[in-house]
Amino acid sequence: MEAYFPQTTRDALAGLLPSQMSGRFPEMPAYLTQDVLLRAAGAVGAIYAIYISGLVIYRLFLSPLAKFPGPKIAAMTSYYELYYDVIHKGKYIFQIEKMHDKYGPIVRINPFELSIRDSEYYDELYVMGNIRKTDRYEAFVEGVVDFEGSHLATISHDLHRKRRKPLDPYFSRQGITRLEPMVAELTEKLVVNRLESYKGTGKVVRLDHAFTAFSGDVINRICVNRPSEVYVEDEDFAPWWFDMFHLGAVSLPLFMGMPWLIRLIRFMPASLASYLNTSMGSFSKFKLMCDEQLNEAKREKALKSKSQNSNQPTPGRLTLFRHLVDSDLPPAELSDTRLSREAQVLIGSGTMTTAGTMGFLCYYIMINPKIRARLSEELGSVMAEYPAKKPSLAELERLPYLQAVIKEGLRLSYGTMHRRARVSPSQPLLFKEWVIPPGTPVGMSAYFQHRDEKTFPRPMEFLPERWLGEITPAMYRNYIPFSKGSRHCLGMNLAYCELNFILAAMFRPGAAPFELYGTDESDVRPVHDLIVPMPRLDSLGVRVVYN
């Protein structure tokens, strides 16, 4: 060994041994003094300040959107929006309203996005695919709680069309007709078997919990055909199911402003997420539930394949999830991750907004005795023998006052308040004298469309009569609870079906009487734009007592 290494080299190597290290480190070089470190930190700070200054100058004066009106602070930074949506819990929509009041029908609401408040332009922006391709705003996709890959969170127009195609048959009018008996059955179980069983007990019932349970069971039946009503049959209508969506909605603005949090949750165990933050844990548990349902669909597919090979009957009906895993989508579109996120979107979007509208409608019907009496009288023509004889959806849709009540409820509950930003990827958009560059996110909100005084006089009043008699083209144009165009709400027909059956059963002649308990307008009137509209966050819900 010594023959290969001279003494000086052996001494140097020995100096690396732990026992020798303390005496062989050289002294700290002079250039690493505290003064120099402070200067280095100052230089880094100066570079960062120059970068921020340059970014602000670009956004205010050089950006393609610099020509559009709006507050300078909104053009400079997205933190202006984040402040109102995170600190004030979904209040930016009201700031946008003030911007339009001050600056006009088109405003720049953040460094990258425009908002338009002009009812006549809606049909120009939200178009079908044969007119113009429409992409989704990338920042929205990144912030919608790990739904990337689902049809809802797909940016590309063409890819969205491919992903949505297998879903459309289930939620078409014809598809909902096939599901009608199931919805009618679950309606009877909720209203007759559960709610009316509380008659004379004095028990306070939260209708928002009951309706969330109902909508959850409906969409679960569609997706995986669960044999039992997991939520409706729960003693208190599975309040955790409601709380999961409520907490999730409250957290959405934070995730949209800081999408990196989603990636953190993605790799975090559900138990740890729950410990750190209740809403984070809710998302993790919801994801696990959707994964289980997707695996159930895959097991059904395996049983189907086995039964076909053995000439046995195929087990069960073809559920939506089973249809997805058995579809002719390319392999990349059938990955576990993407299908799991699709499942989360279908179950989540099929539950919360419809249930919220049911509670909203019940409140306004109950506080208006004339509306309640007129609705009950009209329902008598098809509900006299209920539940022994159930009306069809088509029969309910022929009742003009029932349809007017539903339309007015959807108008005032908005469907969603949030602006649905759309992107024209290759063509510029024209709005009055403005040319909007391709690739610019542009949004419009049902909150503005549904409150247009020219179209809907006395817009904040619940007036079903406005939908009777002559309905003007402007009313049809402005009525957008499910949006329009190539990306309109997939579950529109299902929502109408559920609303018809629930209201018919709740307010039919001879139904067990129920009254509001400790509930006022603040418990239903939307005041927070959390993607879905929500009333005051400390509300105790729509509570009733069956007399």
UniProtKB/Swiss-Prot annotation:
Pfam families, alphabetized: p450
Intracellular or extracellular location(s): Membrane
Membrane topology according to the record: Multi-pass membrane protein
Pathway, per record: Secondary metabolite biosynthesis; terpenoid biosynthesis
InterPro entries to which the protein is assigned, alphabetical: Cyt_P450, Cyt_P450_CS, Cyt_P450_E_grp-IV, Cyt_P450_sf, Cytochrome_P450_monoxygenase
Molecular-function GO terms, alphabetical: heme binding; iron ion binding; monooxygenase activity; oxidoreductase activity, acting on paired donors, with incorporation or reduction of molecular oxygen
Similarity field: Belongs to the cytochrome P450 family.
UniProt function note: Cytochrome P450 monooxygenase; part of the gene cluster that mediates the biosynthesis of the sesterterpenes ophiobolins, fungal phytotoxins with potential anti-cancer activities. The first step of the pathway is performed by the sesterterpene synthase oblA that possesses both prenyl transferase and terpene cyclase activity, converting isopentenyl diphosphate and dimethylallyl diphosphate into geranylfarnesyl diphosphate (GFPP) and further converting GFPP into ophiobolin F, respectively. Other sesterterpenoids (C(25) terpenoids) are found as minor products of oblA.
Protein name as annotated: Cytochrome P450 monooxygenase oblB
Source species: Emericella variicolor
Lineage: Eukaryota, Fungi, Dikarya, Ascomycota, Pezizomycotina
